[in-house]
Amino acid sequence: DRQKTLAFGVTKSISEGFMKMRINRFLEKYAGGRIYFAVNNTRQLLEEINTMKLDFAIVEGNFDKNIYDYIVLTKERFIPVCAADYVFKKEIACLEDLFEEPLIIREQGSGSREILENVLGSRNYTFQSFRSVMEIGDIGITKELLKDGSGITFLYEMAVKQELKEGSLKEIPLRDFDVCHEFALVWLKTKHFYDYYQKLAEELKTSMSEPEIVKNTQI
């Protein structure tokens, strides 16, 4: 149906690397119709699916598998990150060593925040275990704060791929922190549309696996 609106969303973490995943090529197949594309945190995207504003979303946060059908697209590393020249209060070897550093976290409803909260909780820690906590809802601002040496954070390697490559940010090596999480295409549970979303998922996987095209242009 070329007139049907394709309404979908991705989380803020995923949107940071989503254009690099060749989303344009995926969307080209639906250029004859209308597209509604949203970027929000996991909680808000799931609410928009519930109210039928979105057909599906790509999320990294947790969701109720009794309510939603899903297809796993990929699994991504969740890593501690800081500025390349960040000066730590002490030698860093394990997660507990970071507690003397200021922590930057995402807003309530963020899948990234929930994952970090769960990891800390499994070890009987909380955000308050850190020296100070700053809550920022924008990943771009978070990156700038990191580059300025304002603290450390935990996020998906994909979201800072460029910064890690260029050397403005670095992964903090920890001997006791090895976390990966699934990115999934999620929609309201129904037996009628699984084949349709399975096809979408395969198209997305293909787009995500295509190499980035570097253009020699100045912006």
Predicted regions and their residues:
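Short, well-ordered beta-strand segments
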Residues: 5-9, 57, 81, 104, ...
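A late-sequence structural motif
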Residues: 18, 170-213
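Short beta-strand->loop
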Residues: 69-79, 165-179
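Hydrophobic hinge/microswitch elements
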Residues: 41-45, 50, 60, 125-171
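Secondary-structure junction motif
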Residues: 103-124, 194-195, 201, 211, ...
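Flexible hinge/capping segments at coil-to-helix
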Residues: 67-108
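Immediate post-signal peptide segment of exported/extracytoplasmic ligand-binding proteins
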Residues: 1-6, 96-100
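Central regulatory/effector-binding core of bacterial HTH transcription factors
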Residues: 3-66
